[in-house]
Amino acid sequence: DSLSDIVGGIWKLFAYASLRRQFPIEPFYVDCEAAPLSKGGSFIGHHIMVPKEGVAVHINAFNFPVWGMLEKVAVNFLAGVPAVVKPATITSYLTEVVVREIIASKILPEGALQLICGSARGIIDHVESQDIVTFTGSADTGKMLKSNKRIVEEAVPFNMEADSLNSSVLGPDVEPGSPEFD
C-alpha cells in the first residue's frame, strides 16, 4: 500500500527539482517584463519574487506520509524556505525514514528540514507573517487551525486540503493476477 505513496512522492520531488533549472541562480526571481502603468511610462510595475523569511509548517494527513511531505517541501526548497513537517502520528514512521535519509544525504543545509512526530500541540502558536502553514486532513481540524489567533492576527498564509477522498473501484471482471488488482 505504501509503494504508490513512496514512488509518487519521489516522482513529485524530481518533477519540482526539474523546474529549478528554469530559475536563475539568484535569491530572487523576476516574473515577466515590466508593465507600463501610466501614460508615457513614468510609472511601471514589475513582479519580483523573493522567498519568505520564515518557515513553512506542514501538517499532513495519514494517507500519504511520504508523498504529502515531499510535494510540499519541494516548493520550499525551491524558494529557500525551511520546512517543519508534522505527519499524522499513525503513519509518521514512513515519513521519519524518508526524512532521516534526506538529512543523512547532506543535500540540504542543516535545519532546512525538521520533523515532529507525535503531538505538536501549540505548533502554530508562534507563527508570524513571514511563515506559512499548510494542512491536509479533516475539515473540522482545518477550520480550528485556520482560526488560530496567530494565524489571524499575523495574517499567516494558510492552505488547507480537507476531507479529500481517495478510492479505487474495481469492476467484477478484475481478478487476482490482473494488472488492476496487483
Predicted features by range, described:
Residues 1-42:
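Long amphipathic alpha-helix in the N-terminal Rossmann-like dinucleotide-binding domain
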Residues 13, 95-98, 126-127, 145:
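Hydrophobic packing residues within well-ordered alpha-helices of enzyme cores
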Residues 25-106:
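Conserved small-residue-rich beta-alpha loop and adjacent elements
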Residues 45-46, 113-134:
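A structured beta-alpha segment of the ubiquitous adenosine-cofactor-binding alpha/beta core
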Residues 56, 63, 117-125, 137-142:
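Beta-loop-alpha module in the N-terminal Rossmann-like domain of NAD(P)-dependent dehydrogenases
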Residues 59, 79, 86-88, 116-118, ...:
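Generic beta-strand/beta-sheet core signal
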Residues 101-106, 112, 130-132, 141-182:
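ALDH superfamily catalytic-core signature
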